[in-house]
Curated annotation (Swiss-Prot):
It holds the Pfam family Homeodomain. SUPFAM superfamilies: Homeodomain-like. Thyroid, lung and CNS. Expressed in restricted regions of the developing brain within the diencephalon, in parts of the hypothalamus and neurohypophysis, and in the telencephalon. One of its GO terms (biological process) is positive regulation of circadian rhythm. GO terms for cellular component: nucleoplasm; nucleus; transcription regulator complex. Keywords: Activator, Biological rhythms, DNA-binding, Homeobox, Nucleus, Phosphoprotein, Repressor, Transcription, Transcription regulation. This is Homeobox protein Nkx-2.1. InterPro entries: HD, HD_metazoa, Homeobox_CS, Homeobox_NK-like, Homeodomain-like_sf. The modification Phosphoserine is found at residue 255. It comes from Rattus norvegicus (Rat). Residues 233-244 have a biased composition (Gly residues).
Amino acid sequence: MSMSPKHTTPFSVSDILSPLEESYKKVGMEGGGLGAPLAAYRQGQAAPPAAAMQQHAVGHHGAVTAAYHMTAAGVPQLSHSAVGGYCNGNLGNMSELPPYQDTMRNSASGPGWYGANPDPRFPAISRFMGPASGMNMSGMGGLGSLGDVSKNMAPLPSAPRRKRRVLFSQAQVYELERRFKQQKYLSAPEREHLASMIHLTPTQVKIWFQNHRYKMKRQAKDKAAQQQLQQDSGGGGGGGGGAGCPQQQQAQQQSPRRVAVPVLVKDGKPCQAGAPAPGAASLQGHAQQQAQQQAQAAQAAAAAISVGSGGAGLGAHPGHQPGSAGQSPDLAHHAASPAALQGQVSSLSHLNSSGSDYGAMSCSTLLYGRTW
C-alpha cells in the first residue's frame, strides 16, 4: 500500500516539514529552549485545511516523525570529538563534555507539561534521585584513578590455613602400637609419660589413641561382615541349605552312634568260615542246650523201655548211652552256622526215632536169646 495520496496536490510533505527542520537546526546551534520549535510547529499547524488533510492521509507515520523531531529539539548537540573519546575508552576527555541542561524543565512551557501540582508520590522518588540540576560530567575524570586506589589497598585477611599434618617416625609408631596392645585407654599421667618418652605432646598421643581405637573397631566390623557374607554365599551355593546347616548338625549330634557291623551271611553262605561271629556263639550255646535236653529225653525213654523189658536190658542200654551223648558235639558242630539249624532239628528227631528202634530191637534179641 502506497503512503502517497491518489490525487496530486499543489504542495508536498517536504514543503510542510522544511520550516521545522530549519528551526530545529537553529535550536541545536544556539542551545535554546523549546519556544522556537513550538512556534514553528504552531505555524505549521496554521496551514490551510488541505495541509491537515494531507497530514491525515500520511497517517501515524507522519505523527511519529513529528513527535521524534519535537523531542529531539530540546537535546543539545554533542561534539564528535568528545563522544569519540568516550567511545574509545579515554575517560580523561570526559571533562570536555558540555554540561547537561534540562531545557524542557527550564522552559516557559515546562509547567504546562509537568503540571503545577505534581503527584504527592513524586517527592519520595525525587529525594532519592537528588535535585534536577545539571549533571556535571566533569567528575567522571576521576574514574581513571580507581586502578591506583585498588593497588594501594591492603589485601583482605584470608581464612587461617590448616595446620600441616605431623608424620610420626617408625620408632614412635612402634612404641605407640606396643602400648596400645597393652592398654587401649591411657590416663592423663600415663599419656604425659608416654609423650615425654617418644618426644610428642600429650595431645598428639591422645588423638593417635582415639584414631587407632576407631580403626580397630572398623576393621573388626568389616571382618565380621566379610565372614558372614562368605557363609551366606557358601550356603547358597549348596542348594539353598545355608539356613538348615545348624539344624542338620544338631540332628547329627542327637542321632545314635553308628557302629560298623561285619556281614556274617550272604546268599545263605557264611562269609567267615574259620572265625565264628559274636552272634553265632550265642546261637551255638542255645543249640547245645536244646541238644542236651533232647538227649536227656531220649535217655529217659530208653530207661523206661529197659525197665519194662528186664534187667538184661539195663546192662545193654547204658552201653549205647555214650553213643547218643557222643552225638551232641556233632550236633553242636552243625549248629555253628545259622543255616544248619533246620538240619540240626531234623537230625535230633531222627536220633530219637533211631534210639527207640534200637531199644525195641535189643529187647527182641534178648527175648530170642532166652528162648534159645
